[in-house]
From Swiss-Prot:
InterPro entries for the chain: Enolase-ppase_E1, ENOPH1_eukaryotes, HAD-like_sf, HAD_sf
GO molecular function, one term: magnesium ion binding
BP term (GO), one: L-methionine salvage from methylthioadenosine
Name of the protein: Enolase-phosphatase E1
């Protein structure tokens, strides 16, 4: 396969990084971003208001209602495009300050470095993906892997990850046949959708990932490292 399409959490970095590091960092920091926002939010205000105005009208009527809405989305891990954009803004500053570095697995770093055509597909925004891969933790230093990546896809540019059509769109956007792509993910339903679209696909098994059923282990090709890929 000449083109690799990679999921992020649970695949190239620990699933705990997002839930135990990025999400808590966002939840702690985001209220400070709302101090200068006027409520009810009007998109014409510009700046951050343009992003937040994408939330339901009732959610942006007051700062307390907005906080409740955001906290609920985060708690339920809802893949909301507006939330993802706001998170990306907060994380951008966190990476810039050195508060955040991405713990990408060594075998994944080596795979990206030796591969000729690697794309990323995550439910996190493209902006957040670029931030993560431009601030990879290598022995305490922040390393930029983005020059090795050919492109990025998220739920706004490609669609939801458990839908076959999303993978067909990605192949079309890359300009290749789906059969030329191999998709790696820890999520069996995502792997299933990619296979249905005609891509090759493998389930990535990492510490902390959801346990695979015996049926899934037999039905899908599984790897625990990119070393042999």
């Amino acid at each position: 396969m000449s083109i690799a399409l990679l999921d992020i959490e649970g695949t190239v970095c620990p699933i705990t990084f997002v839930k135990d590091c990025l999400f808590p960092y966002f939840s702690k920091q985001y209220p400070s971003y709302l101090r200068d926002v006027s409520f009810p939010i009007d998109k014409s205000d510009g700046g951050l208001a343009d992003v937040l105005a994408g939330f339901p009208k009732e959610a942006v009527a007051s700062i307390d209602q907005l906080k409740n809405h955001i906290d609920d989305l985060v708690a339920r891990d809802v893949k909301d495009p507006v939330l993802k954009s706001f998170q990306g803004l907060v994380w951008k500053e966190g990476y810039a300050k050195g508060d955040l570095k991405a713990p990408v697995y060594e075998d994944a770093i080596a795979f990206i470095n030796r591969s000729k055509s690697v794309y990323i597909y995550s439910s996190g925004s493209v902006g957040a993906q670029k931030l993560l891969f431009s601030h990879v933790d290598v022995n305490g230093a922040s390393v930029d892997l983005t020059p090795k990546l050919k492109g990025y896809f998220d739920i706004t540019t490609a669609g939801f990850k458990q839908e076959k059509d999303s993978y067909l769109k990605i192949a079309a956007d890359i300009g290749c046949d789906p059969a030329d792509v191999i998709f790696y993910s820890d999520n069996v339903l995502e792997v299933k959708a990619a296979l249905e679209a005609g891509m090759a696909s493998k389930v990535v098994v990492r510490p902390g990932n959801a346990e695979l059923s015996e049926s899934d282990k037999k039905s899908y090709e599984c790897i625990s490292s990119f070393t042999a890929e």
